[in-house]
Amino acid sequence: PPRSTLFPYTTLFRSDVDGVKVKGTKFAVYAPSATAVSVIGDFNFWDGRRLPMAKSLLGHWVLFVPGLGAGLRYKYEIKDPFGNRLPHKADPVGFYHEQYPSFASIISDHRTYTWHDAEWQKSQLGNKLERPMSIYELHMGSWKKSENGQPLTYRELAVDLLDYVKNMGYTHIELMPIMEHPFSGSWGYQPTGLFAPTSRFGTIDDFKFFVDTFHQNGIGIILDWVPAHFPTDAFGLAKFDGTCVYEYEDPRRGWHPDWNSLIYDFGRDTVRRFLIASALIWLDLYHIDGLRVDAVASMLYWDYSRKEGEWIPNVDGGNINYEAVSFLKWFNEEVNRKHPNAVTIAEESTAFTGVSRPTSTGGLGFNFKWNMGWMHDSLEYMQTDPFFRKYHHGEMSFSMIYAYNENFILSISHDEVTHGKHSLLYKMPGDEWQQAANLRAYLGYQYAHPGKKLNFMGSEFGQGSEWNDNAQLDWWLLKYPKHQGVQKLVQDLNEMYKKEPALWKRDYDPDAFRWLDVNDAEHSIFAMLRSGDDGDCIMAVSNFTPVPYVAYRLGVPTPGTYKVILNTDDKKYWGSGYGTGSDEIVASNISYQNNYHSIVLDLPPIDRKS
């Protein structure tokens, strides 16, 4: 792999021994307080007496072992400052690891794969904010199972998942963490191998093939990356050399009460370099297109999920973790400097200022931020009985008050369809038909609203049950017209979205959006206008009631003919086919709603009407 100036790691190596070039493996591990470190593995009967390592002044232990090549298992035997032998440790910067029960690291060779995605890399040049992004979030282990009930491998997913995502029209996929992790029930959010794709689904080359194949078919890949915390497994980073090498020593800073995990010491230079080296490896070695940083809010606040007296204030007496702020800025600067085409995305659940603003202006430097406020408010509105929605009208429109404070992604993620929250379909009120109609209307509203798009797997066809990470999606539902209709709608929304620059080119330009009607709470109607370049416009009108509105007048800014390009109530989507009166609507010179022109159209209901 490429040399890292940030953190040393074990690598295949060619060394000079008495003037002769000798192939082997150079091991390197950071354990500054250890009194002894040895490499143990298949090659020395796991005997710590055979291959002791030498300690550098900086606290790194290194050893070159001739003749060792890829595929051999290894760990480190470490003695703490008092000479006590610790549980055998996996390599913190290992590129490949075994599964339970050993969790051993495996020597890897990154020179065996040849990439074929040069055209994709060239295509990613340019302004990241002015591109369409419709992201399909998924959990690799539960998207689909093989006939024997096992998760699909990287290479199987490179066929089945690719075909599906490409056919559905998504621009990107986002993978819930595939960094190596011991506990499947963590969904990957408690990783121990920040440099390694999990071996659950195949080899390193298999994962590279997966990424490469998606790129060759024009689809980007974003990874969830977890620098906020790590698990306490004895073979992992916890008390790595008998002391707190990676975590804060004081549990008021180093222990996460929500997840029973340990928090990285963001003020320690070696920890910062370790984490940023991990981020860059995914972009360097695995050609990943972006990283979504998980649980940013838990990093930013000392008092996150802590009661009074359970946290230590910063030097100014406040609750902001300046060390984490500094780390996140450096992370974004390094990614932008070394991989300017890559995107960084923050899952940040508070109103922290400037998350997606440049570090040069005081921001954290992310390219995008999940809009969790929009997600919460809009879902709360959609779960309200349509009869009472008029009293909650502002929940659906409030997002535009702050829409341009950040570069938002409208995310409806895995967090919304688990832990008793119901599937997206079953959040909707009403009978079977009304639930589907509400879901289709909601998805249409999401695609019309400014901001990039993200939806979790299963939502695109109206998954009925909550997401279960131990089972595959309910693919059998697609034999029913209702679910076929939702899936067809999402497919058409994606294709329309990509073809219409007005829906993405100026997502973050306030001059490219205006409400045409945002005050009709009585009828629960919203109408918006999105503008692209050269006068290109898209108008979206939403009726969130079970009542059809005939000859509904709407003010428009320009004369001419307005063409209906998508109707979520179309029969092909399992809608009623109520229609809008005409597929082409000519604007009149009748002034209305502070516009010089207006159109008249019929608005379909979220109910079965003929």
Question: What are the language-model segments listed below?
Answer:
Residues 8-131, 155-165, 169, 433-436, ...:
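Carbohydrate-interacting/catalytic domains
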Residues 1-5:
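Short, exposed "boundary/linker" segments that immediately precede the start
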Residues 29, 76, 138, 165, ...:
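Conserved, mostly hydrophobic/aromatic
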Residues 95-96, 118-130, 139-319, 601:
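Substrate-binding/active-site clefts of carbohydrate-active enzymes
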Residues 196-200, 315-322, 431-433, 477-484:
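A short acidic, glycine-rich active-site loop
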Residues 31-33, 57, 67, 139-144, ...:
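Short, flexible loop/turn elements at secondary-structure junctions
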Residues 160-161, 206, 210, 271-282, ...:
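Alpha-helical packing segments of well-folded alpha/beta enzyme cores
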